[in-house]
C-alpha cells in the first residue's frame, strides 16, 4: 500500500483515513505493508509494517520506469550553481559539464537514496516522480511478499503504476479527492493527467463517496464498472468526553480544516457575521492553515467581528480532540468535499454538526443539518438555532452519536477486502 502520510505526521484527512483503513484491514486478517515517502520511527506499527521510501537504495539502470521519467517536465537554468568555489574552480566545473554533457538530473548516475520531505512543498511534482522510481524498487525488493497494490490519492498513483509494471500484481487506486474538488474548474493539468493515468491503469478505483465516483466517471472517462464506493469511517477513542468546565460561558462554533477554497472558509466567516448581529454570546474558531488565511483574517477585521473570532493555526492529534471538546457546534461548509471525516469526529465527541450538501459524508448522515455551501443565510440560521435552542442541540447530539457509532473502519475495511478478493 502506497500513501503520502501516516499518523502521527499528517496534514489532513488522507493520513487519518489511511490509518483507519489499515487498522480495519488488520481485523480482517489482511497484512499491510504501508510505504510512505518519509517515516519518522514513531508510527504505530502494531497492525501494519511501515516502509520508509527515503531508506530504499534505488539504482536507475533499469529502463522499465523510463516512460515515467519521460513524462516529467523540468525547467532548466543554463548555469551550474555550485556554492563555495573560487571563480577558476567554477570554470573547471563548467568546462567538465560541457565536455561530458552531464546534467544535474543524470538518471544513469542515480544510485543513492532519495531523501523525501514527505511534505507538500514547491518540489512536490519531483518528489511524486521520484517516489514512483522508489516504488518500482520496493516492488522488486518485496517480490513474493504481496498479492496486490493499493495506492492512495494522486500523489502515489505513479508509484502504484510503477509497482504494477514491475510485479504484474493488480492495482487498486483510492480516490480521496479529485483535482476538481481541490481547485474547482481551475484544475492543474499535471495533477489531472496523473489522476487519469492512475485510474486508467488501475484494475479497480475506490471512491470515498458516490459524489466522488460520479465525478470520476463523468470528468475522467473511467468506466462505471471499474469504480466502487466505499465510504470513510471514524475511529472511536476514550479521549472524546466533553470537559465539565471550559473557562468561557459563550457558545463556541468551530471550523476545522484547511483554509482553502475547497473548504469554504469564507462562507463560515460571512455566516458568523450574520449570527453575531443577532447574539453576542458566541465565539467562532477557525482551526487550520492554508492559502486563504490572510484573506480570511482581513475579512474578519473588515466585518468588525475580530473580538469574537479566533484563529488557532493548524491542529493535530490531541489538539484536535481538545478543540472538539470545547466546541458547541461544528461547521463544515465545504464547496466540494469528497467525503469529510471531521464531522464524524465531531459527532463522536458529542458535538452537533452542520455540513454542506455538497459533501460525500452527507450521503451517510441523517442527523446532521445540511445546507448548500453558498447559502450563507441558511448556514447562519442553522448555527443560531443550535446555539440558542438547547433542545435542538441535544437532539442533534444524541441522534448523531448513535448514527456515527455504526460508521466503523472495520466495516469499511470489509468492503475494501471484498474489492481485493474480486481481483485475486
Where are these regions (language model features)?
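Aromatic "clamp/platform" in nucleotide-sugar-dependent glycosyltransferases that forms part
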Residues: 335
Amino acid at each position: 500500500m502506497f500513501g503520502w502520510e501516516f499518523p502521527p505526521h499528517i496534514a489532513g484527512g488522507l493520513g487519518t483515513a489511511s490509518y483507519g483503513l489499515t487498522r480495519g484491514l488488520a481485523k480482517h486478517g489482511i497484512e499491510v505493508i504501508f510505504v510512505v515517502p518519509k517515516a519518522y520511527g514513531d508510527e504505530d506499527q502494531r497492525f501494519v509494517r511501515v516502509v520508509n521510501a527515503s531508506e530504499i537504495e534505488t539504482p536507475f539502470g533499469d529502463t522499465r520506469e523510463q516512460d515515467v521519467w519521460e513524462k516529467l517536465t523540468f525547467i532548466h537554468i543554463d548555469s551550474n550553481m555550485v556554492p563555495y568555489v573560487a571563480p577558476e574552480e567554477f570554470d573547471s566545473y563548467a568546462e567538465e559539464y560541457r565536455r561530458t554533457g552531464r546534467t544535474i538530473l543524470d538518471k544513469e548516475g542515480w544510485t543513492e537514496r532519495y531523501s523525501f520531505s514527505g511534505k507538500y512543498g514547491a518540489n512536490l511534482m519531483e518528489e511524486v516522480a521520484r517516489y514512483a522510481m522508489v516504488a518500482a524498487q520496493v516492488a522488486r525488493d518485496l517480490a513474493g511478499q504481496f498479492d496486490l497494490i493499493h495506492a492512495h490519492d494522486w500523489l502515489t498513483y505513479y508509484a502504484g503504476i510503477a509497482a504494477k509494471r514491475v510485479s504484474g500484481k493488480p492495482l487498486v487506486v483510492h480516490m480521496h479527492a479529485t483535482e476538481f474538488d481541490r481547485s474547482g474548474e481551475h484544475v492543474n493539468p499535471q495533477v489531472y493527467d496523473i489522476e487519469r493515468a492512475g485510474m486508467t491503469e488501475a484494475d479497480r478505483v475506490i471512491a470515498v463517496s458516490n459524489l466522488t465516483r460520479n465525478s470520476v466517471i463523468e470528468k475522467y472517462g473511467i468506466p462505471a464498472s471499474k469504480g466502487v464506493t466505499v465510504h470513510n469511517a471514524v475511529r472511536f477513542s476514550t479521549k472524546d468526553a466533553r470537559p465539565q468546565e471550559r473557562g468561557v460561558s459563550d457558545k463556541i462554533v468551530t471550523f476545522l480544516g484547511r483554509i482553502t477554497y475547497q473548504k469554504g472558509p469564507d462562507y463560515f466567516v460571512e455566516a458568523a457575521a450574520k449570527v453575531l448581529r443577532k447574539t453576542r454570546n458566541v465565539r467562532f474558531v477557525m482551526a487550520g492553515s492554508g492559502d486563504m488565511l490572510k484573506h480570511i483574517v482581513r475579512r474578519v477585521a473588515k466585518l468588525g467581528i475580530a473580538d469574537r473570532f479566533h484563529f488557532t493555526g493548524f491542529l493535530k492529534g490531541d489538539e484536535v480532540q481538545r478543540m472538539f471538546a470545547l466546541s458547541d457546534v461544528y461547521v463544515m461548509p465545504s464547496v466540494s468535499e469528497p467525503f469529510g471525516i471531521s464531522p464524524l469526529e465531531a459527532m463522536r465527541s458529542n458535538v452537533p454538526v452542520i455540513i454542506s450538501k455538497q459533501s460525500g459524508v452527507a450521503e451517510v448522515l441523517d442527523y446532521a443539518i445540511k445546507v448548500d455551501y453558498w447559502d450563507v443565510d441558511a448556514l447562519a440560521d442553522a448555527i443560531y438555532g443550535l446555539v440558542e435552542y438547547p433542545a435542538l442541540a441535544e437532539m442533534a447530539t444524541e441522534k448523531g452519536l448513535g448514527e456515527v457509532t455504526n460508521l466503523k473502519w472495520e466495516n469499511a475495511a470489509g468492503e475494501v477486502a471484498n474489492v481485493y478478493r474480486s481481483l485475486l
